[in-house]
């Protein structure tokens, strides 16, 4: 079962002591079309998860996101959890994060970067 986190809760966790790692798992074509990402996120190709999932630290919290929080990020989070990782997917993906952040005070310039 895939577990999720909404943009508001993620924002709170990112300012906490044990902030999760952020992994952008948009398909390569989506990422290349719009390379903006949540600050400090790393992009990983979801189609090559076998190549990178074992490099992640076990037990460390991670949040993955795709464009809309659909099947891409959900399937990657499921796969990560099968490897024993504490993985959540971002509800609504980067689209929801961006829409949510535009109304947040002072965060819009920090939230997305190229």
Where are these regions (language model features)?
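Rhodanese-like catalytic fold shared by cysteine-dependent sulfurtransferases
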Residues: 1-21, 28-63, 68-114
């Amino acid at each position: 079962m895939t577990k999720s986190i909404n943009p508001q809760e993620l924002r709170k966790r990112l300012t906490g002591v044990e902030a999760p790692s952020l992994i952008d798992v948009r398909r390569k074509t989506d990422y290349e079309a719009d390379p903006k990402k949540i600050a400090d996120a790393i992009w990983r190709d979801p189609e090559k998860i076998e190549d990178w999932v074992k490099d992640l630290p076990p037990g460390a919290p991670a949040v993955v996101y795709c464009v809309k929080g659909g099947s891409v990020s959900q399937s990657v989070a499921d796969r990560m959890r099968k490897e024993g990782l504490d993985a959540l997917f971002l509800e609504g993906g980067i689209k929801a994060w961006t829409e949510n952040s535009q109304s947040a005070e002072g965060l819009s310039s920090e939230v997305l970067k190229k």
